[in-house]
């Protein structure tokens, strides 16, 4: 099974922006085990700006230039951490930084698809993030929930998992409505479901429930199941892969026919 896992800033970092080392180690251990079990894994990782803020010891910037500078610093720490932790389990990571233009232009999209396919063939774990240091408002993807959905759509994933600081989609905001109940299964993202979306609760991230519902529409429209789950427990991914009733599962429509122009790759390695 090909799995795209999107990890949010609030799951990777402490509130001040510093890396949550213990939890990140636990996540990478589970991801490595999932890969050892024979699954193909693509990581879409937020955290660059948040980690950069922590590394630079500044407050969350409001201006774009400082945000981009923080992202440039944080991306180095993010990939250093992933490279070090995955290497402990004999896995190799690869970094891909993308912008909206990479999905908007067919040739660039094709290059992205082919690079990801080759990395997976070679046994690497692609780690993808938006290229925040050079992204402009016009060409920004906005949040990594959407990015994860686009990666899942255009690279024929079977499952997209959004790991965040929430358990899933509720009938109302559980922070203000204690009686709210978790919705375990969504067959279709209807206008009624979309009305349940809200803003981002984390001071470090950008994607709230509304962004996750947008991602669900993209993924399920391409035939990809999507699950929103709380990443506080690293082992939750085992239950999701096993099909257990955890978080909120958005059921993919029965079609895998997405716009996908795939160039024939030369077979240069036997993997």
Model-derived regions: residue spans:
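Generic structural motif
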Residues: 10, 101, 253-255, 268
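Single conserved hydrophobic/aromatic residue that forms the stacking wall/gate
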Residues: 262-271
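Anionic-ligand-binding alpha/beta catalytic cores of soluble enzymes and soluble regulatory domains
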Residues: 213, 217-260
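Nucleotide/pyrophosphate-binding catalytic subdomain
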Residues: 1-221, 225, 231-232
């Amino acid at each position: 099974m090909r799995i795209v896992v999107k990890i949010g800033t609030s799951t990777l970092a402490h509130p001040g922006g510093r890396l949550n080392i213990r939890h990140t180690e636990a996540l990478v251990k589970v991801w490595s085990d999932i890969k050892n079990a024979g699954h193909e894994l693509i990581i879409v990782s937020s955290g660059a700006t948040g980690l950069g803020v922590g590394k630079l010891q500044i407050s969350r910037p409001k201006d774009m230039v400082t945000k981009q500078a923080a992202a440039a610093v944080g991306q180095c720490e993010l990939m250093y951490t992933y490279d070090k932790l995955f290497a402990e389990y004999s896995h190799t990571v690869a970094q891909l930084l993308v912008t909206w233009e990479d999905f908007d232009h067919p040739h660039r999209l094709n290059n992205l698809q082919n690079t990801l396919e080759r990395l997976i063939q070679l046994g690497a774990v692609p780690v993808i993030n938006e290229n925040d240091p050079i992204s402009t408002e016009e060409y920004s993807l906005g949040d990594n929930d959407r990015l994860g959905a686009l990666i899942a759509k255009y690279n024929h994933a079977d499952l997209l998992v959004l790991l965040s600081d929430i358990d899933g989609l509720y009938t109302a905001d559980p922070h203000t409505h204690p009686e709210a109940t978790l919705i375990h299964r969504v067959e279709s993202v209807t206008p009624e479901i979309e009305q349940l979306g809200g803003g981002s609760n984390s001071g470090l991230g950008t994607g709230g429930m509304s962004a996750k519902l947008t991602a669900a529409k993209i993924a399920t429209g391409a035939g990809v199941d999507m699950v929103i789950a709380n990443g506080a427990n690293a082992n939750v991914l085992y239950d999701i892969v096993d099909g257990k009733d955890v978080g909120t599962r958005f059921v993919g429509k029965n079609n895998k026919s997405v716009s996908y122009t795939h160039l024939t790759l030369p077979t240069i390695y036997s993997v």
